[in-house]
UniProtKB/Swiss-Prot annotation:
Gene source species: Pseudomonas aeruginosa (strain ATCC 15692 / DSM 22644 / CIP 104116 / JCM 14847 / LMG 12228 / 1C / PRS 101 / PAO1)
GO molecular function (one): structural constituent of ribosome
Family: Belongs to the bacterial ribosomal protein bL31 family. Type B subfamily.
The protein's name in its UniProt record: Large ribosomal subunit protein bL31B
One CC-aspect GO term: ribosome
Disulfide feature: none
Record's keyword annotation contains Iron: no
Length: 87
């Protein structure tokens, strides 16, 4: 490999702010911020909005959306037609 053209690979502390979870991962991410981790060492610090700790696909939690409300309204309106009064 040519010297001086590759980014520095080092441990970086990522913080998922929505779940308040920290991940210490090897990365080449550039940042000017630093933060002291629970091990007492100071690492480069990057904040995240979403990670595997907070994303609904990984947590199993579903967030209610407008379309889910419309489906629930449809099911409520037509619930009597399926195996209901006329059968």
């Amino acid at each position: 490999m040519k010297p001086g053209i590759h980014p520095e690979y080092r441990p970086v502390l990522f913080h998922d702010t929505s779940a308040d979870v920290y991940f210490l991962i090897g990365s080449t991410a550039e940042t000017d911020k630093t933060h002291t981790h629970t091990d007492g060492k100071t690492y480069p610090y990057v904040t995240l909005d979403v990670s595997s700790a907070s994303h609904p696909v990984y947590t199993g939690e579903q967030r209610k959306t407008k379309s889910e409300g419309r489906v629930a309204g449809f099911n409520k309106r037509f619930a009597g037609f399926v195996g209901g009064k006329g059968a």
